[in-house]
Structure formats: C-alpha cells, structure tokens
Amino acid sequence: MRKFETLLLLSPELAADAREALLTTLSGVVEREQGSMITADHWGMRDLAYPVRKQMRGYYVRLEYTAPGATVAELERIIRISDGIFKFVTVKLADAVEEVA
C-alpha cells in the first residue's frame, strides 16, 4: 500500500454538517477499498487568488491516507460526482526519506 494525499477545495456555502458528511463519505470510500485514513486536516476558509465558480473564498481540507492505487481512482470518481467540491488534487507521497548528514 502506498501513502497518498488529497487536497480538496470545498464550497464556502456548504454548512458544517454537510461538510462533515461529505468527508465521512470520502473516508468511508477509502476504508471500503482496503485503505486506511491517516488524517483529515481542516485548513479552514481561505481567500482565493482568482474566482472559482464565481466564489472568492473556499474551504480547504487535506486528506492523508494509505491505500492501493485502485482506491485513488474510486475516490476521485466519487469526488467528481459530489456537489460542493470545487477542485481537488491527489499526489503520491514519497516513501521514507533518508536524511543525509
């Protein structure tokens, strides 16, 4: 299993309970596909550099998880069909890095 990170930009109009329900759904997808959620880091409401869907603010959430590669495809499919998610990006995190003295 590999370690991944997904950064989500959510609509500022999503209520807190709707936002939590969405994140619960996404973490459920990861766990259903034999992955495990490490952390869900809420960065909060931030100003955007340019309008996204006519909004100048967005709510950022960073998800970190370990999962097989097929899980990422399923997670991104669910993200694409979900309302309230403006943008997202998923990256594979590096394996353990050795420090050079």
Curated annotation (Swiss-Prot):
Family: Belongs to the bacterial ribosomal protein bS6 family.
UniProt organism field: Nitratidesulfovibrio vulgaris (strain ATCC 29579 / DSM 644 / CCUG 34227 / NCIMB 8303 / VKM B-1760 / Hildenborough)
SUPFAM superfamilies: Ribosomal protein S6
Protein name per the record: Small ribosomal subunit protein bS6
Function: Binds together with bS18 to 16S ribosomal RNA.
GO terms of biological process kind: translation
UniProt KW Metal-binding keyword: no
Entries under CDD domains matching the protein: bS6
